[in-house]
């Protein structure tokens, strides 16, 4: 049964938080990230470079710290490991999540990279709509990023997402020239949220490294790059903020 009149607006944020280390002052201040995210009032948050057990970061468990401070459900997968500690991708959600999956995007000997997927159960009227979200962090080399996105769009997890199912893909694509969307994501019917916007470095953004893309029964209502005082200093990237209308049809 369809419910054409029912819809729900959700806010999605994507942000490489640089392990809670400021991009200009080099200060480790998790509270700045928490305060910034709280001000955004997002329903779904895609974070990259979330650290655990790193001595130079007081050995903090940023996964627990952030999720508890914001009162959100969380899913996490470690990516890059050090001798002591590691960091990875995290999805925070105000709504319950299920079907947490990981796609390995590591290419050869290069740094471990991946995509974290979750099904978020968004309330729409008296019903729940499954919104499939993917959080990516791609590599630094151009050829590496191309292979990673080719693997991602061809992976089984994505193939099983129906064309009408709300699908959101976001993260740090390290997209220096803004070319990855047109080459790999738009052919899969994934539209960029908003226009191409610079997000790095945070103090004076010159490169459009980050992006949010979407398809299915979801409509973009608003898009912006975080420009508050905290958004400019809390990390070395600026956050992306997108409001979507999710419908049952």
List where the protein language model places each region.
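Active-site regions of metal-assisted phosphoester/phosphodiester hydrolases
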Residues: 1-44, 68-69, 73-249
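Active-site neighborhood of divalent metal-dependent phosphoester/pyrophosphate hydrolases
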Residues: 22, 48-56
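Short, surface-exposed acidic-centric catalytic microdomains
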Residues: 60-61
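Active-site phosphate/pyrophosphate- and oxyanion-stabilizing loops and adjacent acidic/basic residues
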Residues: 64
